[in-house]
Design a protein with these regions (language model features):
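Acidic, polar-rich low-complexity tracts and alpha-helical solenoid repeat scaffolds
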Residues: 1-94
């Protein structure tokens, strides 16, 4: 996760996405997973991968709807004028 954060801050979005994907695949229940999903979507948007970014932010909202990161994802999508479908309740607990 932290290697993804370092790559993201350096503007190395492809590397950041790779590290965030690893967190999501290997540790989907980790407390860092919602942040990894959010950052992955942001990195995709920042690297002009609009559709992938939108998809990942929607996945964030669906997988972790009660997380603070989902609130940020909703805000980002709303700001982009992207419609958000209602999410099902999740098992995410703060």
């Amino acid at each position: 996760f932290y290697l993804g954060e370092i790559a993201y801050r350096k503007g190395d979005y492809p590397t950041a996405i790779k590290y965030y994907d690893a967190v999501l695949e290997q540790f989907p229940g980790s407390p860092k997973a919602p942040t990894a999903q959010l950052r992955k979507g942001q990195a995709e948007l920042d690297s002009n991968q609009r559709e992938a970014g939108i998809r990942d932010l929607r996945n964030l909202i669906q997988r972790y709807p009660d997380s603070p990161e989902a609130t940020q994802g909703r805000s980002k999508l709303n700001g982009m004028g992207v419609r958000i479908t209602p999410a099902k309740p999740s098992a995410y607990k703060e």
